[in-house]
Swiss-Prot record:
The keyword rRNA-binding does not apply. Responsible for synthesis of pseudouridine from uracil-55 in the psi GC loop of transfer RNAs. The keyword tRNA processing applies. GO terms for molecular function: RNA binding; tRNA pseudouridine(55) synthase activity. This is tRNA pseudouridine synthase B. It catalyses: uridine(55) in tRNA = pseudouridine(55) in tRNA. PANTHER family: PSEUDOURIDYLATE SYNTHASE TRUB1, TRNA-PSEUDOURIDINE SYNTHASE. It comes from the Bacteria. Substrate binds at residues 40, 73, 178, 199. Keywords: Isomerase, tRNA processing. InterPro entries: PsdUridine_synth_cat_dom_sf, PsdUridine_synth_N, PUA-like_sf, PUA_sf, tRNA_psdUridine_synth_TruB, tRNA_sdUridine_synth_fam1_C, TruB_C.
Amino acid sequence: MYSEFRSIDGIILIDKPYGLSSHETLQKVKGILKIKKMGHTGTLDPLATGMLPMCCGRATKFSQFLMNFKKRYRVIAKLGQKTSTSDSEGQIIHVRPITFTNLQLQKVLKSFHGKIKQIPSMYSAIKYHGHALYKYARQGIVISRKVRDAIIYELKVLGYSYKHKYLELDIICSKGTYIRTLIEDVGEKLNCGAHVISLRRLQVGNYTSFQMIDIKTLNKLVKYNINVLEHILLSVDNAISCFPEVNIVPNVIKNLQNGQKVKTHSGFINQFVRITEGINRRFIGIGKINNINELYSYRLII
């Protein structure tokens, strides 16, 4: 049975289509690539499109680091209307006139820069007793949610129309930022209300939109020649390329595999490091350096 699966290691940046959940998108890609072990990093709502990094094979060991990267979004908000779901799928529950000036808009957006507090929407994918909150919301059940921290690094106006009542924003934020909640909070501060009508994730960490591939294109390419994956897949260690490198000699690898510490002179005290081996600098995993310059393994792929 398992002979049907391919052994593929690496990271692929999928352009998630509108209407599919992140899990549904993952299953489609797994079916196309015939990969048994695969996972996505960073959930996108069905209404959202854009970058959904997926880790294949041994790259799944490092997916947590992808989740920690900054995210970039382009969002279009409808002004003057608040909905039950904070997006265009919900019912309009409040309508107010738009009275703010451009100066007031800039002042409000500036107030969201830096660390902010958010209460996630009931229509989010946060799990409660094993089920997503939005499943409770659809049954009319309201669950108490804890306030969460987020960081907004940039919040820029790309377009604004008083006549058509829309606001387009470019947002760079930390992991765990709820864009629908952010837009709703901005709308409240503008005293008019707002909800999301379009949301696209353009960037995760240093991965840009130019590196994405959509499902249809991926399917065509793989059917034509499976070897094209070599040009699409990013290397296993790409997710942690920002970490400093510690190169070790081959004869101490067994020590790391057995949970032993290896003396180094790296100076990267209490930091994650990429461990490479030998003169070819073969990537073998992630480690940490303790306060007496000893390297110990965190995740190995050998």
